Regions:
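Histidine-rich, glycine-flanked metal-binding segment
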Residues: 2-4, 9-48
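Short secondary-structure boundary/hinge segments and terminal tails
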Residues: 35, 68, 92-94
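Short catalytic helix/loop segments, enriched in acidic residues and glycine
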Residues: 25, 67-73
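Conserved, mostly hydrophobic/aromatic
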Residues: 43, 54, 75, 79
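Di-metal (Zn2+ and/or Mg2+/Mn2+) metal-binding site signature of metallo-dependent hydrolases
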Residues: 44-69
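Redox-cofactor binding/interface segments in oxidoreductases and associated redox assembly factors
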Residues: 40, 52, 85
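Residues that line or immediately flank small-molecule/substrate-binding pockets and catalytic motifs
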Residues: 12, 54, 87
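Divalent-metal coordination cores built from histidine and acidic residues
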Residues: 73-111
Length: 111
């Protein structure tokens, strides 16, 4: 799949962004080529991803509200590449053992 985003704002510049095989292949002005899809993005800002510094994943202890898997999948669907989970868990995330548990669970989700 190839995609060309035309006339978007990247930083302070208006330019095109070419994406091939889910990776940014080129950024520049007036990119030419045969693309599967072309999006006219006049006046829109292109960002690669977002970071959520205030995420309530609730695992361990409150998985019935949200867990690492469901919260991570929702974050990816919303364009977030990184989330930082709040310590409102049971037990509270206040030591390395709980942090290790969360990191291990995140690896299991494998996004």
């Amino acid at each position: 799949m190839s995609l060309l985003i035309k006339n978007c704002i990247v930083g302070k510049d208006k330019c095109d962004v070419a994406i091939e095989d889910n990776r940014i292949a080129q950024i520049g002005k007036n990119i030419k080529g045969d693309f599967d899809e072309v999006i006219q993005a006049d006046g829109l800002t292109a960002l690669p991803a977002f970071i959520d510094m205030h995420t309530h994943l609730r695992e361990p202890g409150f998985e019935y509200k949200e867990d690492i898997a469901s919260g991570s999948l929702a974050a990816v669907a919303g364009g977030f590449s990184t989330v930082c989970c709040m310590p409102n868990t049971k037990p509270v995330t206040d030591n390395r053992y709980i942090v290790k548990y969360i990191v291990d669970r995140a690896k299991e989700v494998d996004l």
